[in-house]
């Protein structure tokens, strides 16, 4: 609870033969109230994963019920199944769920969020200074670039890091077929968060024009 920096890595023992996608590796309320830092879990988290997360970046291979409840910031990537009531009360941050079977819409609480397809990488944006290009070991900023853009790039970076830190077989498989895998992710975007970001962007544009 309350992670405020650093990195947490929890992975399967080398001799383990169990399937990480069916194995609960961390318990309930992990990353509750986290404000910064990063965490990678090679397995499934229990209930209320990343509740009230306000800035941590994390990858996990499945969650129990009520994941990302009341989340206000940060980035969460789920490479497996989620429980029910995902994103209830989520007002900020972004999440991505791998959803090859198309079941996530029935497990997500969509009262405050929109579910979107992940936008493909855009080569024309390669030189954009806001693009998340940090493929190094550390996360340079909790937002990882403009939350309204760069979904494919952001996702790939985090799946790469998850594989680097945990040796995850699921991450390796996704990266090996990334062109198809990225299309099976769903982005969870809070409605009020998007509106606030668009308003801030509009205000910055007006300020730049006025300065000219």
Each predicted region: which residue ranges?
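Long, distal/terminal scaffolding or interaction modules
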Residues: 1-212
